């Protein structure tokens, strides 16, 4: 076996035909990170017949006076093939040593277990063998984490898409379905955007992701060249929103009037339950009144609508990845992100994609999980 540096084209061809890979193992991602002042190169192992067997995107970062390499999501290799893993590791170490790189860090796509509400925890049968193999090759395991301590998340939420979108919708939790319907009813509309919307996406995500606007621009433009990226946003239709609030206010007004009428009809013998009901209905009316005033102001200030959520998706093989998403916290109550995610699931399911990767989450089985709300 031999190792060599691959050209961008050689790596791209190998990666595109490799059975399982991540957007972070692509030349597009490498070029994006180059714009963030990281160096990168590709290594490939081939046999005597010049057939490429394994490859890796290597990014180099300064660590004081030293340099170390990082392979995001690990090598493009069959980790079940012990001989290939051993040989590739040996050759990579030798190559990096010649480049005065002191270490390599990987976050490989090796599944330890799968958790579903239906089946519970399903342990991957080959994980322990792969784990022990890597340890024997002097890879140092940094330990299991429950939250977001690693460069790439330990846990990912992945949804199996179903072209029967009605059935897929029925599998969503009742609470989530209610929010989706409510968001659609009050006037949230989903639209496809382009690079002109990147500054807005950055504004919505800058507190959540440690990336700058130039990163978003590079990411979008490199993946766009191969039609691998989509940007969508949720717009609050302020006119429709006002109409909906007006309707709810009128309906609530009728309810309040009816309760008041019931009390007058039963003067002197009005039950405590009727009085309590009136207080509850009046409070609801007061809330709607404030919402009505706010909705009127929104229409006056933003007659063309307000963008309240946005997301970037990368399409790779049969899977779609939610790379970045964000929403305006001032409009959290309209549940725009819920509708946006559902509409994207629906769209990609109809296009034949099989999985929807929502990205990193915290440990779903951890008690007293401080990030539990982010998993919902």
Name what the model sees in each region.
Residues 5-49, 54-65, 139-150, 160-164, ...:
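A conserved beta-strand-loop-helix scaffold within acyl/acetyltransferase catalytic domains
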Residues 1-2:
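Extreme N-terminal starter segment of soluble prokaryotic enzymes
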Residues 153:
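Active-site neighborhood for divalent-cation/phosphate handling
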Residues 66-149, 315-376:
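Acyl-donor binding region in acyl/amide transferases
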